[in-house]
Amino acid sequence: MKIGIIGAMEPEVAHLIAAMTNATSQTIAGIEFIAGTLAGKDVVVTRSGIGKVAASIATTLLIEKYAPDAVINTGSAGGFVDTLAIGDIVISSEVRHHDVDVTAFGYEIGQMAQQPAAFIPAAHLVEAANKAIAQLGEVKAIEGLICTGDSFICDPVRTQAMLKNFPTMAACEMEGAAIAQVCHQFGVPFVVIRSLSDNANNDSPVDFDSYIVKAGYHSALMVMLLLEQLK
């Protein structure tokens, strides 16, 4: 079994790369792909860069060049659930674009034309993530809707507008739905694992800078524990 792991930023993949053995690297289109062993599994880890286009390019290259059996998106996110604190984790129950609107043609808000409204992660990956929760210690983890858009959300007015469109949203970030859409088209199972770096409010820029390393570590820890659960 080979697992592809994608994070957007260095703090989101650094702990994973440091824990790998037998690592080899190649760079394609300016994106570094590091293949090796992690938690007893063959993995390929890459830092995609920020945003949906960067994530789509990296995911396509990962699938085409390495043919992973599954893809895990790891990293940070802004939180939308009062019961979660910075550093806690959201496991995707579904993933949607929050900044897509082609409702004029009969699609749901957030649904890209000719695509499903929601991208559903692989059940066996979600199950493995849930089994790993018990080993997280004080870090809390839940399943929930993760939404994606090409914006860093730090405006309470925009936050409320997003919640009006997606009232069950647990977290938002900038890559997950793009990765999920590419996986959907290639028929590759996926899951998104995100640790909260901020709470999508006025303090988000300060919180993000302060807590991105913590969020990256917690998300990476969750990914490694998930890998241990996979058979």
Swiss-Prot record:
One of its GO terms (cellular component) is cytosol. One of its GO terms (molecular function) is adenosylhomocysteine nucleosidase activity. It comes from the Bacteria. Keywords: Amino-acid biosynthesis, Hydrolase, Methionine biosynthesis. It is an enzyme of class 3 (hydrolase). The keyword Amino-acid biosynthesis applies. The active site is at 12 (proton acceptor), 198 (proton donor). Disulfide bonds: none annotated. Pathway: Amino-acid biosynthesis; L-methionine biosynthesis via salvage pathway; S-methyl-5-thio-alpha-D-ribose 1-phosphate from S-methyl-5'-thioadenosine (hydrolase route): step 1/2. Substrate binds at residues 78, 153, 174-175. It catalyses: S-adenosyl-L-homocysteine + H2O = S-(5-deoxy-D-ribos-5-yl)-L-homocysteine + adenine; S-methyl-5'-thioadenosine + H2O = 5-(methylsulfanyl)-D-ribose + adenine; 5'-deoxyadenosine + H2O = 5-deoxy-D-ribose + adenine. GO terms for biological process: L-methionine salvage from methylthioadenosine; L-methionine salvage from S-adenosylmethionine; nucleoside catabolic process. Its EC number is 3.2.2.9. Gene3D superfamilies: Nucleoside phosphorylase domain (3.40.50.1580). The keyword Ion transport does not apply. Belongs to the PNP/UDP phosphorylase family. MtnN subfamily. Catalyzes the irreversible cleavage of the glycosidic bond in both 5'-methylthioadenosine (MTA) and S-adenosylhomocysteine (SAH/AdoHcy) to adenine and the corresponding thioribose, 5'-methylthioribose and S-ribosylhomocysteine, respectively. Also cleaves 5'-deoxyadenosine, a toxic by-product of radical S-adenosylmethionine (SAM) enzymes, into 5-deoxyribose and adenine. This is 5'-methylthioadenosine/S-adenosylhomocysteine nucleosidase. The lineage of its organism: Bacteria, Pseudomonadati, Pseudomonadota, Gammaproteobacteria, Alteromonadales. The gene is mtnN.
